[in-house]
Amino acid sequence: MSSGCRSVGGSTWGNWRGDGGDLRQRRVLSPVCSAPAAGSWIGSQLGNVGNLLATPHPLGKPASSRVGTIVLACLLLFGSCVVRAVPTTPSPPTSTPTSMSTHSHGTVDPTLLPTETPDPLRLAVRESGILAEDGDFYTCPPPTGSTVVRIEPPRTCPKFDLGRNFTEGIAVIFKENIAPYKFRANVYYKDIVVTRVWKGYSHTSLSDRYNDRVPVSVEEIFGLIDSKGKCSSKAEYLRDNIMHHAYHDDEDEVELDLCRPSLQLRGARAWQTTNDTTSYVGWMPWRHYTSTSVNCIVEEVEARSVYPYDSFALSTGDIVYASPFYGLRAAARIEHNSYAQERFRQVEGYRPRDLDSKLQAEEPVTKNFITTPHVTVSWNWTEKKVEACTLTKWKEVDELVRDEFRGSYRFTIRSISSTFISNTTQFKLESAPLTECVSKEAKEAIDSIYKKQYESTHVFSGDVEYYLARGGFLIAFRPMLSNELARLYLNELVRSNRTYDLKNLLNPNANNNNNTTRRRRSLLSVPEPQPTQDGVHREQILHRLHKRAVEATAGTDSSNVTAKQLELIKTTSSIEFAMLQFAYDHIQSHVNEMLSRIATAWCTLQNKERTLWNEMVKINPSAIVSATLDERVAARVLGDVIAITHCAKIEGNVYLQNSMRSMDSNTCYSRPPVTFTITKNANNRGSIEGQLGEENEIFTERKLIEPCALNQKRYFKFGKEYVYYENYTFVRKVPPTEIEVISTYVELNLTLLEDREFLPLEVYTRAELEDTGLLDYSEIQRRNQLHALRFYDIDSVVNVDNTAVIMQGIASFFKGLGKVGEAVGTLVLGAAGAVVSTVSGIASFLNNPFGGLAIGLLVIAGLVAAFFAYRYVMQIRSNPMKALYPITTKALKNKAKTSYGQNEEDDGSDFDEAKLEEAREMIKYMSMVSALEKQEKKAIKKNSGVGLIASNVSKLALRRRGPKYTRLQQNDTMENEKMV
């Protein structure tokens, strides 16, 4: 904005000084006029007047004439300008973008304007200032030295490659043992084939065939198979609670040699007594013929058992429901066994026979025998902890690096490009079942690798450590140190006067060989004291304490064994997660190493730039310290330190004046002058005149001046915008978007790769993969055998026949008496067996609920029969003729009467009485004969002579009694009469 009105007459007089100080005429007259636009006529005239007044007259006229010229110019000026008193509001804005009036907004309260003096010109100048719309302004008091700072000395840049703890060593990785425990077993059984053949006149056909497998008794295995290499042709087996016998070719029992069959299976051996099946056909046609074949078979097969080893399967398809580690020893009795105890037998020091070479084994073994309903199985018993192991060796790693990172161990194996993660705590092998083999195999493998590769270059720095990695992998790790590093440790020990053997220090296992390890003392390590005469009381106390310690230790061990919960280690079927972990760790280490190098270079660069900062602070301490502290401060160098004061934020209003010219005609302000208040709502007396500094800093003094120059152009930051001055006169506000930004920053956007841990994930579990098939052969076989055992021959279902046991005992007794005794025993046992069978059958029939119902029906039927018998007897007594000869009915009687010419109405008065009497005599005679026969039978049954004599006497009496029987005539007299 122009600071004065240009004179019409174009006078060129000098300065005018008033009481208010050296104020240029154009600055005094400018606020009197209305705010003209830049380049307007009034503004140009005011500028000309100011220039005339500022230029001295060449003729050197006196000052009085200059005063008159000034008065005349003012009169002309007031004639062309609209003179205003102290305005209450700034001039309204115009449409011109460069007008100074666009920077005055709203109505200004007169109480907020500065009122140091009642000079209306000064009030007008302040009122015409530019109010800052937004932005923060600060005022900084001069530093006095109460607060001093210094520049930080150069830093030591870190070396990131030494920030992690690495340990090298040898490792053996174990996985879950999913393979079954395999062992050799012998199967003994007799194959029975019973055929039934029908022989016709010209053909023969097979009508029935029965096939069964029966076990060979353990006694026969001892006495024949493993003793002579033979087998009996007799088969004795129990089916349906009945002992059956079968003989080969239906002949007497003989001993047959065991021979190799013509067909041999791979991985198995077998021996049998015959290759043929007997089928007997007789010479007589139209009959059934039955024949029996008994083939004794011994097979050497492979047996398998999986954890928890409660059963095992044979390659023949049979499943034995007992643990292969079951035995009669203390530790083996706790194993599973589903069979009755009499079916199991264990023999110590057994020497089996090789059926091919007919030679017995040299080394005795402990042999187990189990007799199932169909086969007898034998195998060599071994201890479970020695043979079975739930973990198996997977990889031997000759170079492994262990890295401790964020509370976990990372085992990196470059040979297989895998990284395994585990906890920092060691895994206890006792917490998993059957892991005794791990320590032995790990030690052997690690020692073998060490002797081959590292014995001359490295030493062990610890014992074997076990860690359970994610995915179910057990890592047996033994750390090592190079000889050079070990020498450094040795030198450090010597320097610190610690004379220890390096081998014993780095390898604790060496102490075990020398027996120099100091053991922890306990009451168990103290030998049992022997009482003496001098210290009887002390020895008794030691004896009691030692006994308590032994009991406490035994109790603790037993409680630990029973309370310990063993958990099987499950291993994933793939290590892709470990390979991904290795790849990610490799990328992470490479990228982080690269970024660490950049950070190291950055730190080195900062140390070098620190020297530049130290020199620049001597030139502009406030700017350097403010940039360093990221805070507005005023600074001043005090020797080798810097005095600072913190800048205060201005809460009041800040007004920017529109001219940068000072009272001196040759001197101008290098920064725009401002008027401001420290706090809000301050009165006119609280206004302060100052000068705008860099970055919205307000100086409380106006000391920044420079000689006035032509064609001067300046941009100053005022709030959040910029103001443009031309020839020390405000022109307009400039938004920051109109000024192109040149960035001095070099972007360094570094982000370290975060740690990621890959977990093993299984899309399909092992159980799902096993269940994908249509049929499960193992389950089908198990169900079939369990079905047969459950409903037919399992021990818990079949009741023991005590009578059969007694009979077998009696038969054995008679058999021991020789051939005669055996014959007598057969006769006696036959009769006794018949009686026992009858009684047992009746008892079984009565115990059956259907038998009870049948007996009830029989009782009812007996009562009905008794009723009819009683009725029949009574009928005989009342009318014996009708009862004995029911054919003499009324119809026959009527027919007889009709034949004699009588009517039905006629009575029976003409009936022949003589014939009736004869009939009665005949009936009486028949009754007597019947009674006589009964008496004779009783006498014969009792074998009594009196009865026989009485019977004979009765016969004689009957013979002589009564007339003799005369034959009746062929023709009836009545019929003859009718015929006549």
Swiss-Prot record:
Residues 87-849 are virion surface. It comes from the Viruses. The keyword NADP does not apply. Envelope glycoprotein that forms spikes at the surface of virion envelope. Essential for the initial attachment to heparan sulfate moieties of the host cell surface proteoglycans. Involved in fusion of viral and cellular membranes leading to virus entry into the host cell. Following initial binding to its host receptors, membrane fusion is mediated by the fusion machinery composed at least of gB and the heterodimer gH/gL. May be involved in the fusion between the virion envelope and the outer nuclear membrane during virion egress. GO terms for biological process: symbiont entry into host cell; virion attachment to host cell. Belongs to the herpesviridae glycoprotein B family. It is found in: Virion membrane; Host cell membrane; Host endosome membrane; Host Golgi apparatus membrane. Disulfide bonds join 140-647, 157-603, 231-296, 389-437, 668-708. This is Envelope glycoprotein B. The gene is gB. Residues 197-203, 282-290 are annotated as: Involved in fusion and/or binding to host membrane. It comes from Equine herpesvirus 1 (strain HVS25A). Its main location: virion.
